[in-house]
Amino acid sequence: MKEKVILAYSGGLDTTAIIPWLKETYNYDVVCVCADCGQEEELDGLEQRALSCGAAKLYIEDITDEFCDNYIVPCVQAHAVYENKYLLGTSMARPLIAKRLVEIARKEGAVAICHGATGKGNDQIRFELTIKALAPDIKIIAPWRDSNWKLQSREDEIEYCRQHGIHLPFSTDCSYSRDRNIWHISHEGLELEDPANEPNYKHLLVLGCTPEEAPDEPEYVTMTFEKGVPKSVNGKAMKVSDIIRELNRLGAKHGIGIIDIVENRVVGMKSRGVYETPGGTILYEAHQQLEELVLDRDTTTFKMDVGNKFAQVVYEGKWETPLREALQAFVEKTQEYVTGEVKFRLYKGNIIKAGTTSPYSLYNESIASFKTGDMYDHHDADGFINLFGLSLKVRAMKKLENEKKNNK
């Protein structure tokens, strides 16, 4: 009986060509695994395609809810944003996909796991760090770094498939390189490879429209959260995945969540991409609006640093690490009172606050009001400012003393 390899399979050109290559190069039985993270129509016809290319079996694993509940929600709660823009759509998904690859490898008794990530990108790191953390005994095959892989271009892969009698049921024309799941869709390549070029949004966008093309009338949306977890949209209770789908629909309609970023990859190079994250952008903003109301200042400022570190850890593929677990434990503690309702309106790419309420609100109108109130005496500020500015006063006094000495 042949040994088995588990292939992370998308059905695209790369992983289609990898199936016969694995059989020829390693004499393995190829078990394909497609992880459904909410990419929907991209899964149509996948099983037939994999088997016709020589795969022994195909698993289509629906991990959408696990992705939303256990990966997206912690990142939203941490307000993890990489380099102030990227909402980690691909970064969050890869560790979960790798985890499922390991689980199926154990089930099938496979000796190796293969992925089609290139040697220039971040995904190779995200896949392999997770596999190493969960299954250090399993061999990892990365064709684009394998000396036996002779296919150096898209044209080479197309010709290789033709020679092996593989029909490619999709366009082989040069197009954007895309990654899609329930959270986002990313676009790279073509005119985006030159940062001097403006994106061709009419050709590029898949989920939504530009702000200029959005409706001329705003749309009001209300969300509720319980302990930092989204629970409803416009009065309708839903599980997290359905909330994201509904926010995607609303956000895409109003031109929300389109970013053009030049980011620093883990491997050292810069890359340029356009991301569509309509629902995610709304969810991050709504959650942050509620936190503004219920978190104290010290927690808020420290949490900003934690969020930046959380984003870096996730971006670098370090999900299965003690540091990510520790950061998440802190974040979860901060979410105890992040419960309430957030109202906002969507208008031409903008999310405009329209009111926030919480039973745990730390906003006290009788203190904050410009009107005179019993709970705050303006004279109390005298002593506070004297103490708060004491170090500045001492420094200034010393400076004057030294200047007088020098002028004598």
From Swiss-Prot:
L-aspartate binds at T118, N122, D123. The keyword ATP-binding applies. This is Argininosuccinate synthase. ATP binds at A8, Y9, S10, G11, G12, L13, D14, T15, T16, A35, G116. The gene is argG. Keywords: Amino-acid biosynthesis, Arginine biosynthesis, ATP-binding, Cytoplasm, Ligase, Nucleotide-binding. Belongs to the argininosuccinate synthase family. Type 1 subfamily. It is an enzyme of class 6 (ligase).
